[in-house]
């Protein structure tokens, strides 16, 4: 077994999106080849309703999938196909935009005003850019949880772990999306398919991701760490990008550790991207925005 070396640390950056939603962006809208097939990861964690209630009013998507995973609060959504619904704590929405959809996402806090969730964008291969749009909505009760003997709990959003499979299926890039909670002081090795690109996103607790070249390690500390911490320390909004290998090794600190572990097969295709639309060529991108201007974006016979 080959432990994946830590390639890079990325601290999620404050970003303003939608109609004025304050969030943290771990990666996206830049060079994303190291994350292929993934394009963007946003952490929308906030306790101030004025920073998120304006939401994400009606906007288009084409050529991608958006994966919304809510931990606290709710997200009300509607779309151009007539779908309406609400994603609550622990729920998942996997939207395949395909040839085109226009939708809105409006967050609401819980009883204490807290809102927390993630949105991940996954690219679609050229052969599926113009597929029929669809949703896979999953309630929290339908997300399997694998409980290991050491107390580790893994919520399986997509892919498999410990002989159990997540509820989201039929996704081109064969992604694995896990929400991992490791008890204090425990050391854990998690399998990752060798040919996949993989990253972890820490959002709770503290710990170390162990490098292939021990004793090098990456520490993650709780939010609010002071300048006295060593340069290798990062708060719990840190993304850890891994090199190749077939496992990830992690050591939880005194408070335990919680993180997303996400991997997928790289598409290795050209990316032409502007805003909410991702195609393979600039001509396809221009054509998509032309269709938006002309009111033909949602037609079933719309061409690339």
Mark where each language-model region is.
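Jelly-roll (double-stranded beta-helix
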Residues: 1-304
């Amino acid at each position: 077994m080959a432990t994946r070396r830590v390639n890079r640390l990325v601290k999620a950056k404050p970003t303003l999106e939608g109609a004025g939603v304050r969030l943290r962006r771990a990666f996206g809208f830049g060079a994303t080849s190291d994350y292929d097939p993934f394009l963007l990861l946003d952490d929308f964690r906030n306790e101030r309703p004025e920073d998120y209630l304006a939401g994400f009013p009606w906007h288009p998507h084409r050529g991608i999938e958006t994966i919304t995973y809510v931990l606290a609060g709710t997200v009300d959504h509607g779309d151009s196909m007539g779908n309406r619904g609400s994603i609550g704590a622990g729920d998942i929405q996997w939207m395949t935009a395909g040839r085109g959809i226009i939708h809105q996402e409006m967050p609401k806090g819980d009883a204490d005003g807290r809102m927390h969730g993630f949105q991940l964008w996954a690219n679609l291969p050229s052969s599926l850019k113009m597929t029929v749009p669809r949703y896979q909505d999953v309630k929290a009760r339908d997300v399997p949880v694998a409980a290991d003997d050491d107390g580790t709990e893994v919520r399986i959003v997509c892919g498999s772990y410990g002989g159990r499979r997540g509820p989201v299926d039929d996704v081109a890039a064969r992604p694995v999306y896990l929400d991992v909670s490791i008890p204090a002081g425990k050391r854990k090795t998690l399998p990752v398919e060798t040919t996949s690109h993989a990253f972890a996103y820490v959002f709770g607790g503290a710990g170390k991701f162990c490098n292939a070249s021990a004793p090098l390690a990456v520490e993650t500390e709780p939010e609010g760490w002071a300048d006295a911490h060593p340069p290798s320390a990062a708060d719990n909004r840190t993304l850890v990008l891994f090199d190749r290998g077939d496992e990830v090794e992690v050591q939880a600190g005194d408070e335990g550790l919680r993180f997303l572990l996400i991997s997928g097969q790289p598409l290795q295709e050209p990316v032409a991207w502007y805003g909410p639309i991702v195609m393979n060529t600039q001509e396809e991108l221009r054509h998509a925005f032309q269709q938006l201007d002309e009111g033909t974006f949602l037609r079933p016979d719309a061409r690339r």
